Amino acid sequence: MTGFARFAELCERISQTSGSLEKTDILASFLSDLESDDLRIVAGFVMGVVIPGTELGVGPSLLYESISRATGLSSDAVNELLRATGDPGLVAYRAVERRKPLTLAAFSGSEGLEVQDVYQRFLSIAKASGRGSQEIRVKNLQYMFSEASPLEAKYIARLAMEDMRIGVGEGLVRDAIAKAFGVSKEDVERAYNLTNDLGLVAEYAKLGRLNELGISINRPIKMMLAQIGESIEASLAEGATAVEWKFDGARVQIHKDKGNVRIFSRRLEDVTSSLPEIREIVRGHVRARTAILDGEAVATGEDGRPLPFQEILRRFRRKYGVARTAKTIPLKLHLFDIIYMDGASLLDEPLEERRRVLVSVADPEIIAEQVVTSDVHRVEEIYREALAAGHEGVMLKNPSSTYTPGKRGKNWLKIKPLLESLDLVVIGARWGEGKRANLLGSYRLACIDTDTGELKDVGWVATGITDEMLAELTELFRELIVKENGMEVEVHPEIVFEVGYEEIQRSPNYSSGYALRFPRLIAVRDDKSPSEADTLERIGEIYRLQRGRSKK
């Protein structure tokens, strides 16, 4: 069993190391010494992932209440620490340093926290629901802070916020697993894309069984992604393509196991209970005994046209009153791929074969229409039809391409009328002036560096926010403020904005090296987590594409 103090010391050492290679070496050495049970947990913890695909549901106010109870400090004293540090981890560190003697014996008899203890406490927090769930979360956090040293408390708090702030992302953990257990980075990445669980990948790599990890029913896999197509004509340069509408909806991955149907969102979170009609559609219209299906759920109005994306998100977020909401925001299912059927993986089959299988097991009314053609004019016609129907554009897919989980490449291209929007994490905000003095009027945006997990800013957005939205957003972000500096505030990176813009420019003013010209808010993407924000690499690709440049 691994003491949590050892894990906290690892995080502290990594945070004080600047180079990615050095960080990889430190982490690889640590992972190689762990037993399998602890290894699986630590590989996730170091990225701020406690349970893959599951949010803990701990907000800043709940965290600070737990710290206050565990240390005996008043709420005002905890808030003063927050104003001074702007970091939940440092708040916990300093609060535990000042912990009142009475609280030290509150949970006597402990021999110190272990990684397994902390994991089980967070598991209880994640499972808490319904009446009394907030108190369950507070008490579990209170227990951990009562038992923790200042350094342990620092990283318990950051785990609770799912933000470790040590510069470790998926890429670095992948490389560390490969180095620790003598396997290739490519094999680690393949296994991760098939399981969405680097902890599980690390465990199997240690056992020398990495090749045993594959696609499995009821375990979501990363979805194949599309990149931006330069134009219809350029996209058809290599021959015939499979053309489908790009629906204005929400991506879903559906796992059917006989009569049991589970639905996963783009974030690979289980949303089955929120989408009962999709579950029933699959039960009634898919004949395969077991299957993993890829598709889009679209909210439709009385005229058959898609409703705004925010309406779809209302369905995905809904936990209570689902039946009532389903009547006002009905969903249609459009399936476009099948990647597993009756015990066999279809990942390595070409798209045209996967399509044949899909058509053989699903009824036509739930399958997205597809036309295979090399005729530019026919594709343009389908593109115009999609836009006229209220959808986003078209997808152009290579008929001979395999399904590559988690990959964005030229085998799937999306053609839309405007520059591709970006999904960016909000990391700060600025108070307004005059009549908007009590409202947060503009928001600082960041992309993610996948190698380090760090957020790199790309500018601010204020356009596209109505007065009504200002009030709602202010309430949303007020809870997430971690530090104030004059008119500006730093917020916990939890909310993702979909942002449009005129172009991407090079800029030395932001840590990303890029800036958005004339950004505007399109939507608050509640269906996406910060880890799913657009990457620094992708912003660079869009910059080169809009300039007609090729990567050097």
Curated annotation (Swiss-Prot):
- Catalytic activity as recorded in UniProt: ATP + (deoxyribonucleotide)n-3'-hydroxyl + 5'-phospho-(deoxyribonucleotide)m = (deoxyribonucleotide)n+m + AMP + diphosphate
The record's annotation in PANTHER family points to:
DNA LIGASE, DNA LIGASE 1/3 FAMILY MEMBER
GO MF annotation terms? ATP binding; DNA binding; DNA ligase (ATP) activity; metal ion binding
Q: What is the main EC category here?
A: ligase
**Matching Gene3D superfamilies:** DNA ligase, ATP-dependent, N-terminal domain, DNA ligase/mRNA capping enzyme, Nucleic acid-binding proteins
- Name of the featured protein: DNA ligase
Q: Which family does it belong to?
A: Belongs to the ATP-dependent DNA ligase family.
Residues reported in the UniProt entry to bind ATP: E244, R251, R266, E296, F336, R408, K414
**What are the recorded Gene Ontology BP terms?**
cell division; DNA biosynthetic process; DNA recombination; DNA repair; lagging strand elongation
Return the EC number.
6.5.1.1
Q: Which cofactor does it need?
A: Mg(2+)
Write out the entry's keywords from A to Z.
ATP-binding, Cell cycle, Cell division, DNA damage, DNA recombination, DNA repair, DNA replication, Ligase, Magnesium, Metal-binding, Nucleotide-binding
Coiled coil, from the record: none
| Biological function | DNA ligase that seals nicks in double-stranded DNA during DNA replication, DNA recombination and DNA repair.
**Native source organism of the sequence:** Methanothrix thermoacetophila (strain DSM 6194 / JCM 14653 / NBRC 101360 / PT) (Methanosaeta thermophila)
